[in-house]
Design a protein with these regions (language model features):
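Conserved catalytic or regulatory cores that recognize and/or transform ribose-phosphate-containing ligands
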Residues: 1-152
Length: 152
């Protein structure tokens, strides 16, 4: 990695508040970080209630918003140098990686970008084979490796 590596954070919307904290920690280490558009909106408003942003559940006409958010983040991944997956516990499952983050990881993998995952991979995932096949760097909750790689 060259100095000035741009890290794109990928995460379930349920983890966006944590993602903002991780972003702040990486920025303090001199790393450029991009978070999803909804995470930026949550940070600006201070409202981290996911339901307030996922309006397509109530109004199917809003799925175009979901599509735009996905496309925008895919563009951010394409323009970044690596991704960091925030995979906290969700629905009682440690290391949760949902379908949207799997798609983002697949894009990064296809583009030969390093994939960092904050916590251990989920146990008994229906896509365990695919996750392991992307050869991610598992940080085990510690950002030091990512920071070191980004500063080289």
């Amino acid at each position: 990695m060259s100095k000035g590596m741009k890290v794109v954070i990928c995460s379930s919307a349920a983890f966006y508040e944590h993602a903002i904290g991780v972003k702040d920690e990486l920025v303090a280490a001199g790393i450029e970080v991009i978070v999803p558009k909804t995470a930026r909106a949550m940070e600006q408003s201070g409202n981290y209630e996911v339901e307030a942003y996922k309006t397509w559940y109530e109004n199917a006409d809003d799925y175009d918003k979901k599509a735009e958010l996905m496309r925008t983040h895919f563009d951010e991944i394409t323009n970044g140098d690596s991704i960091l997956v925030i995979n906290d516990e969700k629905h009682g499952k440690p290391g949760y990686i949902g379908p949207n983050v799997l798609m983002e990881m697949s894009l990064a993998w296809y583009q030969k970008k390093p994939i960092y995952i904050l916590n251990d991979l989920p146990k008994e995932s229906p896509f365990e084979e695919e996750l392991k096949g992307m050869m991610p760097v598992i940080l085990k909750g510690n950002l030091e490796r990512l920071i070191r790689d980004a500063q080289q």
